[in-house]
């Protein structure tokens, strides 16, 4: 899944998942220069691990003023990753992240990447993941199901190896958003599911 966004203002602390393992990663492509004062992404290093104090103690990091006497921007151990146009930041979906002071112009593209499901357990995790982190999960109609039409229409077989499984799972989860339903196409793809 991925998106292009035009952010304004603050994005409070949150993880994009709680998988407890490296299952998904977010790749953010920045289009504007961002500093700690103008909306740079902030990370809490190590917070993706189940044994990190934030997770172990079930700390609400957005309550830092009451808990630690510091504003959200100064959560203990957090860092700001300042970026320039063209910079890429990649992090584990379980990592707590935020952005503060974003003003009215904070443009970025993101891609959420997961590993291919090879076992029934992996397939269950991918289904849970795509039920939330996908066009259907966000209730966004792309006109082509899981991916923007250009992503699929320009894909050679090497790229389709990576796209086929999420497309099939997304179509099962959100059949009314499937490309063949939206565009009246037939699909005779061989299943990529385990």
Specify the residue positions occupied by each region the protein language model found.
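Non-heme Fe(II) oxygenase catalytic core, chiefly the N-lobe of the double-stranded beta-helix
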Residues: 1-85, 97-107, 111-128, 193-194
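Non-heme Fe(II)/2-oxoglutarate
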Residues: 88, 94-194
């Amino acid at each position: 899944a991925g998106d292009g966004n035009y952010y304004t203002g603050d994005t409070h602390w949150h993880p994009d998942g709680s998988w407890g393992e490296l299952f998904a990663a977010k790749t953010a492509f920045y289009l504007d220069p961002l500093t700690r004062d103008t909306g740079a992404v902030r990370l809490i290093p190590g917070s993706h691990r189940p044994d990190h104090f934030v997770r172990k103690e079930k700390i609400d990091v957005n309550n830092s003023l009451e808990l630690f006497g510091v504003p959200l921007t100064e959560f203990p151990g957090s860092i700001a990753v300042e970026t320039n146009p063209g910079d890429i930041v990649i992090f584990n979906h379980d990592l707590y992240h935020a952005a503060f002071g974003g003003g009215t112009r904070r443009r970025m593209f993101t891609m959420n990447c997961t590993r291919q499901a090879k076992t029934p357990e992996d397939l269950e995790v991918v289904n849970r993941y795509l039920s939330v982190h996908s066009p259907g999960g966000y209730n966004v109609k792309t006109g082509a199901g899981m991916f923007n039409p250009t992503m699929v229409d320009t894909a050679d077989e090497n790229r389709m190896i990576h796209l086929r499984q999420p497309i099939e799972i997304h179509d099962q989860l959100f059949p009314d958003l499937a490309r063949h339903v939206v565009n009246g196409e037939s699909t005779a793809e061989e299943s990529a599911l385990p």
